[in-house]
Curated annotation (Swiss-Prot):
PROSITE patterns: AA_TRNA_LIGASE_II_ALA (PS50860). One of its GO terms (cellular component) is cytosol. GO terms for molecular function: alanine-tRNA ligase activity; aminoacyl-tRNA deacylase activity; ATP binding; tRNA binding; zinc ion binding. Zn(2+) binds at residues 568, 572, 670, 674. Its main location: cytoplasm. It comes from the Bacteria. This is Alanine--tRNA ligase. SMART domains: tRNA_SAD. The gene is alaS. PANTHER family: ALANINE--TRNA LIGASE, CYTOPLASMIC, ALANYL-TRNA SYNTHETASE. It holds the Pfam family DHHA1.
């Protein structure tokens, strides 16, 4: 039975028993900052279990995409080395939200395994929580499991909780006996042993208590069930294999790697580990990118980067010199695309993101490995076996080596890594970064706003149809606390029962304006929306005293609102134009819509060409000139999706959504404010296009008068440049070309003179050459205006020597610089890198390089003479 057949069979089994089949959620958990990735089937049902969400069904079943590669589930270093560890896996599950409980859950699990799949009951064992007599009796009396096959374990193994407080309850696990041939051989081996003989295949969690802060547990009024069975594990049972990597779920990728590498699986254990690593990481990488994660140096993106770079290193170990991970996407999609069609829809985009990251890492991999190998060699010579935190940080910060990748590489040499030292370096860097941090705009919900919302304080937004409104002041906040009144000069937050002010959300900046009563005036400098139905005006009382309960007039700053609306509608048109020019893979990855500009982040794998930017500008301006009417309509989310409206990738929407349409060219789910017709935008001009992360580009643009003023500024600059270059008739390009040609000519003259100067200088320096063990050696301090010129001088000296070693030093800006060069005929016997490593500590620095050329820098220029004097003693 294939993995795809098993998945379908499981879902059908529970669908036939009244369960709603629910698609897997994205790997990026929605509105759950406690989770890096979805790592269990119950993640998407968390609010259902807590009684905070009613989905219209009380029984559900799913096959959930999961990733475990960070936090307490960080098994990355074991992936590929064991039979069971994975970064990506699928969790089959059935769930009851106050519907059935232990009797039914146990019956379903036993029936599916023993009757539907036909597993041998004599090879199945169960565990229960030590105090859960109820579950033990159900297993024995209802399902006929002998008492000796029912094992009891404590809270560590068989009790589940959502946190320190909240829903919790006992677990009951089902184990499969793989047979004594895969066990540890101990006569005491039984369920619970760490060996591979007894393998957990299904876990049933019975949520029946609520744990309070003092540890007291009270029964839940509606107990629930959460179960999970790893698809990869049940596949090993059904396919009669001992390793998850031998199932068809992963063998397809391994066979693909065999074909690409020309190597055979199961012929060399080292190669086997690399093939398993690539097979697992290819699945994780493909699914993560498909679900919107992109490689970066923080958060989820950093986990993805670690996975990809570990796979890239193992590909190199298999002999691949060119990027190959992107080529495994075909094999992953061949196996998984039928169940997850989004993989096929985004296949080309996924490949391009992977290849771009592989090429980026390839640029630094060899250099980083050279640094690491030098460090290992030096530490071995000193009798040490721990890679220092400073070295780890340099490899991470300069060459993109995650610490677990470094640990993986040096393990074979018997080395470990100094993780605390690395964290200390990272902490110093974070502290420096924090000094320059200006905030991300993603503020958490303040406690006072939560309290007001829980108390029932609400705001109705009426700003789609009006910019002025009359309302009652429901609450005034000052310094994070609720007050009855506020006086002139005080900063406040004001909540009214209705408001025309748009609260910052969906990338659109909040409105500004004024709030007035008969005796007070407030200047509103910003508006936020901590909850969909709670809008908070922020500002300063500029006159009088404003009081809770008073009636007030609210007036939005019309000029800013209109400018923001122009930019927001233009953003919608921009997305349409980008998809037409670049392709359907373009998805919104973020945006900012403010009165003075717009910013749009989107998924794309390469920098846009000038021609592509020009075409996008032309398309958007054509839409503006066509002046289509802008319509907004609320509808059911299903209707909106069926109509083809564009949704923000990964966003979770309610039952009702607002769809904004611009003629027939754009339709998006959007709650923002817009112009009435496209022509109101006036004009559109792109200011810049740049990459902000792997696979993510950013466009900044202007509309209306802002675009016109920008063009006028460019014309002014052009006139100023023409005047500076004395370009007749404003022919800047012709004049500039002539100036550049003259500059190149002068540069050639300088280089010729520099060569003559070096030759003359080298003639003087050669008088200091000594012969050591049959090798001509020159070690001397020189005066140069730029340390980079040490290399040019060394090349000249090597040519004049014919065969020998040149060591040069110079002082510049209070720093010592050293360079060692070895002629090619001696590089096999004398290594420049070995010499420089001996000299660098003398000048208080570090260095490295290749056999023929190495450099070092240090903080003690007064020690240059001593360092250079050591060179002669290092020539063997």
């Amino acid at each position: 039975m294939t993995g795809n057949e098993l998945r379908a069979r499981f879902l059908k089994f529970f669908e036939d028993r009244g369960h709603t089949v629910v698609p897997s959620s994205l790997l990026i958990p929605h509105n759950d900052p406690t989770l890096l990735f979805a790592n269990a089937g119950m993640n998407q049902f968390k609010d259902c279990f807590l009684g905070m969400e009613d989905r219209g069904y009380t029984r559900a079943t799913s096959s959930q995409k999961c990733v475990r590669a960070g936090g307490k589930h960080n098994d990355l270093e074991n992936v590929g080395r064991t039979a069971r560890h994975h970064t990506f896996f699928e969790m089959l599950g059935n769930f009851s939200f106050g519907d059935y409980f232990k009797k039914e859950a146990i019956a379903f699990a036993w029936e599916f395994l023993t009757k539907d799949l036909g597993l041998d009951k004599d090879r199945l064992y169960v565990t229960v929580y030590t105090d859960d007599d109820e579950a033990a009796d159900i297993w024995h009396h209802q399902e006929g499991v002998p008492r000796e096959r029912i094992f009891r374990f404590g809270e560590k193994d068989n009790f589940w909780s959502m946190g320190d407080t909240g829903p919790c309850g006992p677990c009951s696990e089902i184990f499969w006996d793989n047979g004594p041939e895969v066990g540890c051989g101990s006569p005491d081996c039984t369920v619970g042993c760490d060996c591979d003989r007894y393998m957990e295949i299904w876990n049933n969690v019975f949520m029946q208590f609520n744990r309070s802060a003092d540890g007291t547990m009270t029964p839940l009024p509606k107990p629930s069930v959460d179960t999970g069975m790893g698809l990869e594990r049940i596949c090993t049972v059904m396919q009669g294999v001992k390793s998850n990597y031998d199932t068809d779920l992963l063998q397809g990728v391994i066979r693909h790697v065999e074909r690409l590498s020309g190597k055979r699986y199961r012929e060399n254990e080292k190669d086997d580990v690399s093939m398993r690593v690539i097979a697992d990481h290819a699945r994780a990488t493909t699914f993560l990118i498909c679900d919107g994660v992109l490689p970066s140096n923080e958060g989820r993106g950093y986990v993805l980067r670690r996975i990809m770079r570990r796979a890239a290193r193992h590909a190199k170990m298999l002999g691949f010199a060119e990027p190959v991970l992107y080529r495994t996407v075909d094999a992953v999609n061949e196996m998984m695309g039928g169940s997850y069609p989004e993989l096929l829809e985004r296949e080309e985009y996924i490949k391009k993101v992977i290849r771009a990251e592989e090429e980026r890492f390839a640029e630094t991999l060899d250099r980083g490995l050279a640094i690491l190998n030098d460090a290992v060699a030096q530490l071995k010579g000193e009798g040490k076996t721990v890679i220092p935190g400073e070295t780890l940080f340099r490899l991470y910060d300069t060459f993109g080596f995650p610490t677990d990748l470094t640990a993986d590489i040096v393990r074979a040499e018997g080395f470990t890594i100094d993780e605390p030292g690395f964290e200390a370096c990272m902490g110093r860097q974070r502290e420096q970064a924090r000094e320059h941090w200006k905030g991300s705009g993603e503020e958490g919900i303040a406690a006072v706003h939560k309290e007001l919302h829980n108390r029932g304080v609400r705001s109705v937004f009426v700003g789609y149809d009006e910019k002025c409104s009359y309302a009652a002041i429901g609450s005034i906040l000052r310094g994070g606390s609720e007050v009855a009144e506020a006086k002139a000069g005080e900063d406040v937050e004001i909540i009214t029962d209705r408001t025309p002010f748009y609260g910052e959300s969906g990338g659109q900046a909040g409105d500004t304006g004024t709030i007035s009563t008969g005796s007070a005036h407030v200047r509103v400098t910003g508006t936020i929306r901590p909850y969909p139905d709670l809008i908070v005006h922020r500002g300063t009382v500029v006159e009088g005293t404003i009081k809770t309960g008073e009636a007030c007039d609210l007036k939005v700053a019309s000029v800013d609102r209109d400018a923001t609306a122009r930019n927001h509608t233009a953003t919608h048109l921009l997305q349409t134009a980008l998809r037409r020019v670049l392709g359907e893979h373009v998805k919104q990855a973020g945006s900012l819509v403010a009165p003075d500009r717009l910013r749009f982040d989107f998924t794309h794998f390469a920098a846009m060409t000038p021609e592509e930017i020009r075409r996008v500008e032309e398309i958007v301006n054509t839409f503006i000139m066509e002046n289509d009417t802008v319509h907004a309509r609320e509808m059911a989310v299903e209707e909106a999706m069926e109509s083809g409206a564009t949704a923000l990738f990964g966003e979770k929407y309610g039952d009702r959504v607002r769809v904004v349409k611009v003629g027939e060219v754009s339709a998006e789910l959007c709650g923002g404010t817009h112009v009435r017709a496209a022509g109101d935008i006036g004009s559109f001009k792109i200011l810049s296009e740049a990459g902000i992360a792997a696979g993510v580009r950013r466009i900044e643009a202007l509309t209306g008068m802002g675009a016109l003023r920008h063009i006028q500024e460019l014309e002014d600059e052009k006139r100023q440049i023409a005047a500076l270059m004395k370009a007749e008739g404003g022919d800047n390009i012709d004049r500039l070309q002539k100036l550049l040609a003259r500059q190149r000519e002068m540069q050639r003259e300088i280089e010729t003179l520099q060569g003559q100067l070096n030759a003359a200088k080298s003639g003087d320096l050669l008088a200091d050459v000594r012969e050591v063990n049959g090798v001509k050696v020159l070690a001397t301090k020189v005066e140069v205006d730029d340390p980079k010129k040490l290399r040019e001088l060394a090349d000249t000296l090597k040519d004049r020597l014919g065969s020998g070693v040149v060591a040069l030093g110079c002082e510049k800006d209070g720093r010592a610089n050293l360079l060692v060069a070895v002629t090619k005929d001696l590089a096999g016997r004398i290594r420049a890198g070995d010499i420089i490593r001996q000299l660098a500590p003398v000048i208080g620095g570090s260095g490295g390089g290749k056999p023929e050329l190495a450099q070092a820098g240090g903080s003690q220029p007064d020690m240059l003479a001593e360092a250079l004097g050591k060179v002669y003693g290092l020539i063997g």
